[in-house]
Amino acid sequence: MASALSYVSKFKSFVILFVTPLLLLPLVILMPAKFVRCAYVIILMAIYWCTEVIPLAVTSLMPVLLFPLFQILDSRQVCVQYMKDTNMLFLGGLIVAVAVERWNLHKRIALRTLLWVGAKPARLMLGFMGVTALLSMWISNTATTAMMVPIVEAILQQMEATSAATEAGLELVDKGKAKELPGSQVIFEGPTLGQQEDQERKRLCKAMTLCICYAASIGGTATLTGTGPNVVLLGQMNELFPDSKDLVNFASWFAFAFPNMLVMLLFAWLWLQFVYMRFNFKKSWGCGLESKKNEKAALKVLQEEYRKLGPLSFAEINVLICFFLLVILWFSRDPGFMPGWLTVAWVEGETKYVSDATVAIFVATLLFIVPSQKPKFNFRSQTEEERKTPFYPPPLLDWKVTQEKVPWGIVLLLGGGFALAKGSEASGLSVWMGKQMEPLHAVPPAAITLILSLLVAVFTECTSNVATTTLFLPIFASMSRSIGLNPLYIMLPCTLSASFAFMLPVATPPNAIVFTYGHLKVADMVKTGVIMNIIGVFCVFLAVNTWGRAIFDLDHFPDWANVTHIET
């Protein structure tokens, strides 16, 4: 039996890849309707995405092949979905993130903030979480985690080395004093105290490493380009509800998601404090207590790492200027509560010529123009070697670095999702699914939101968060229309819940990076992550039912969601 299972496991990928399409064929043969053929493609891609028998990006290209073959969409209609406005927005954000990483600006910001926060355990953890979340808003969660965890590890090792040296000194003193004590007065407390301190150190290591991957996942939810699911939502809104008129943009998303991120970050910090530090605030926060040697050692590590960076370079200053320019232009384009710069010359009737993608590509282009060194204008006093060098220094980015660092697979993954949404609309699958869900009209909207958010949070533990939102959001949009509910009331919380992969090392790259350092067991991640998932879902539920209602007018079924207004 065991050998048979081993044999099956060995050929699992082969079986899934070739047998799955054959098993699903009866669907198409028995019910040759167009929407059934579209469902066949979606189910097949969902299985391939969940099992990853072929790369996610390659699976995302399947609509280009299957939709024309099944006469769902012609090739031109499918291919155009892979380079839409939303894809360009995400691509521009990724290029800016590459520039920040290339010149180590993210590391400087992180170390400077941690030095300001201090080295007391609770404050240090809060500092790590705040910095990680802040960076994860703008650069990828994986890159943020990969940069932060080595800093955490260096601090933990230095603290452990200092504690070990202190214990060795105390042991020598105790041995000297033990000779003076009568036998009846010898109390064997040394090993117990040592074990207790060792357990405390292990708990601290677990807390410090977990806080990084949690903060990276939470931080990415705060901005529209912070993580893939957010961009999927924007693309699905533009595809399924073209009359929504830029309702979801950088400013409106930030107004909704950033406060939610802060609330979640606070609860995550409190939960980690409770599980691993037992809420000993006097000891871990350090109120009125003198710094211990291991805390001074941690501070020394941070100071040394910051010293290695040297003074702020010309390139870092220019990247910082470009970054602030990007954020300011995003926020001020169409803030909602006042006319933005968009209205000056780029609005004609109902048409808005400039989007957030335009801004992202503009700043991304600047990074290939702005110099990384100061240009030298003093030609008379130049040496022979200086005369040979080009007058204009190299730019902040070149295409070789950009090509290597940008995760192009995610761009294709987004395109695949938009192609599926287009195919669902064109084939009538969206309308059919909506009709099947009409009985949900009797269920309270709040209950629907809560249940579906929990479903997505569990599903994303096993599947890519982008693939999860790509599969679920069109279904939820159809369901919302069929029961007369504002689609964003369902789509917003489910999009955020797709980023709550806290339970398993394989759930998301930040979890995997943290797990490889050896401080955590799978049981530790599951035990802590289950409650984190619940915290995340309820925080989002709170956000949607409070300030989310005001920002997106979630109490009313909007005209832009009416099926008669949607082009098919």
UniProtKB/Swiss-Prot annotation:
Q: What is the effect of changing residue 410 to V?
A: No effect on its function in citrate transport
Keyword terms, alphabetized: Amelogenesis imperfecta, Cell membrane, Disease variant, Epilepsy, Glycoprotein, Ion transport, Membrane, Sodium, Sodium transport, Symport, Transmembrane, Transmembrane helix, Transport
List membrane-spanning regions: 13-33, 53-73, 80-100, 124-144, 215-235, 252-272, 311-331, 353-373, 406-426, 439-459, 487-507, 528-548
What's the effect of swapping residue 427 to L? Answer: In DEE25; loss of localization to plasma membrane; loss of function in citrate transport
Glycosylated residues: list them: 562
Question: Where does it live in the cell?
Answer: Cell membrane
InterPro entries in UniProt: Na/sul_symport_CS, SLC13A/DASS
Subunit comment for this entry? Homodimer.
UniProt similarity note: Belongs to the SLC13A/DASS transporter (TC 2.A.47) family. NADC subfamily.
- UniProt-recorded name of the protein: Na(+)/citrate cotransporter
| Taxonomic lineage | Eukaryota, Metazoa, Chordata, Craniata, Vertebrata
Q: Which gene encodes it?
A: SLC13A5
